[in-house]
From Swiss-Prot:
GO terms for molecular function: phosphorelay response regulator activity; transcription cis-regulatory region binding. This is Transcriptional regulatory protein AruR. Member of the two-component regulatory system AruS/AruR, which is involved in the regulation of the arginine transaminase (ATA) pathway in response to exogeneous L-arginine. Regulates transcription of aruH and aruI. The modification 4-aspartylphosphate is found at residue 60. Phosphorylated by AruS.
Amino acid sequence: MAMVPRVLVVDDDPVIRELLQAYLGEEGYDVLCAGNAEQAEACLAECAHLGQPVELVLLDIRLPGKDGLTLTRELRVRSEVGIILITGRNDEIDRIVGLECGADDYVIKPLNPRELVSRAKNLIRRVRHAQASAGPARQALRQFGDWLLDADRRRLIDHAGNETLLTHGEFQLLGAFLRNSGHTLSRDQLMDQIRNREWLPSDRSIDVLVGRLRRKLRDDPAEPQLIITIHGAGYLFTAAASDA
C-alpha cells in the first residue's frame, strides 16, 4: 500500500490553513499546518526525526518575519522536499524569484482547490519517482568538464570535492543536457524532457532553471562555456559526459 502523502501548509492566514487542511485531507493527504517559517522548520525537523518526512510544502510567499522566499532558499540548500509557492495575483516578480530560489511550482490566490490538488499530485509523484529511481543499477557518477554528477544523491562535485545539491528540476534539466550534449534543444524540447509541471506557452521557468543551473555550475551567464544560449533556437550544452 502506498504511503499517505504528508503535506505541510505554511500560511499566516488561519482561514487558508483550515481550508487547505480540510480540502487536502478529503483527498487523502496527511496535512500539517504552520503559521510562520519558524513553526514550519520545527515541524519539518520533527517529522524527519520521526522518520515520517514531509513530501510537499505549500508555502505562502508573504509570511511575517522570515518570508516564504527566504525559507524556500534555506530549505533548498539542505532538502529536496517539493515546494509549491502560494502567491498573490500581482506577485509575478516574486514568483520568478521563488523559482530561482528553488521552488518547484506556484499557485495564485484566490486558490482553485482542484488546480492545487492536481499540482500537488504531480509534484509528489515526480518526487517519489525520482527517489525510487536512485538505485544500485544506475550509473551513479557521470563526469563532464570539471564536474562529477552523483546521480544517486543528486549532487554536483567539483575538482576540490565540494558538493552542491541539485533540485529535482535542475537535476532533470542537467540530465536532458547530458543526454543531448552538442545538440541545440528548444525550450519546448526541454519542457517535454523534464516534465516539471504543466507548462504555459509564456512560461519562463525553463530560463529560470537554466539560470539556476548555470550558477551552480559556476558558468558565467555573460560568457557561458557550458550552457550556451542559441538566440531564437534554445540552449546548447557543450560538455560531453562519460562514466566516472
